[in-house]
């Protein structure tokens, strides 16, 4: 029994030391597109319901130094893969009078982590969203952030971030006067550690 407890304690110390070493300098995570799905939320029929368009193809990187409490994100979203779950609505969202994905196939978000918890997890990002060929400031709240211990295998960090913007600021003014202009951006993301 004591031997088992000693082994568990030793493993815990090893995990702690390994994790501390891992986050003692900036580390880079590559966004895992299989577990990363940003979405745009917009009201439908004058507020009757909320529709969510999920982006099915995303790439980018996350760099973080939890000890120094610094970091940055760089996310590219393939707007041609947006999916509202209804073919007619998805096709219209991609059309020239809304997102015009033929001319503006990607949207990007880049930013610097600006606030952290005492444990080194980011809670806010100050950045810029480029959508429909227009770039504007957009700050995100990091609602959750967690990394698994390296002893579990590959090192993976995940986060959920959110923010809102006026789509008219990006030239997406379809339905102005009939629909609300404010849109929520939700980003669920997982990144895999880039090994040296």
Task: Please identify what each model-predicted range represents.
Residues 3, 23-24:
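Hydrophobic membrane-targeting and insertion signals
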Residues 2-11:
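Bacterial N-terminal signal peptides that target proteins for export
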Residues 24-196:
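Low-complexity, acidic/polar, glycine-enriched regions of mature
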């Amino acid at each position: 029994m004591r031997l088992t407890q000693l082994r568990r304690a030793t493993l815990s110390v090893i995990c702690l030391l390994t994790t501390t070493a891992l986050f003692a300098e900036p580390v880079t995570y590559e966004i895992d597109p299989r577990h990363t799905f940003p979405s745009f939320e917009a009201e439908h029929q004058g507020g009757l319901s909320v529709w969510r368009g999920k982006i099915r193809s995303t790439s980018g990187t996350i760099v973080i130094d939890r000890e120094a409490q610094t970091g940055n994100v760089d996310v590219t979203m393939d707007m041609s893969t947006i999916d509202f779950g209804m073919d007619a609505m998805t096709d219209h969202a991609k059309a020239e009078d809304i997102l015009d994905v033929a001319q503006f196939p990607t949207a990007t978000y880049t930013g610097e982590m600006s606030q952290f918890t005492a444990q080194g997890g980011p809670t806010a990002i100050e950045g810029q969203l480029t959508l429909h060929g227009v770039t504007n400031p957009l700050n995100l709240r990091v609602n959750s952030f967690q990394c698994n211990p390296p002893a579990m295998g590959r090192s993976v960090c995940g986060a959920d971030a959110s923010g809102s913007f006026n789509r008219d600021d990006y030239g997406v003014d379809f339905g102005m006067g009939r629909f609300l202009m404010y849109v929520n951006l939700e980003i669920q993301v997982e990144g895999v550690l880039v090994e040296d």
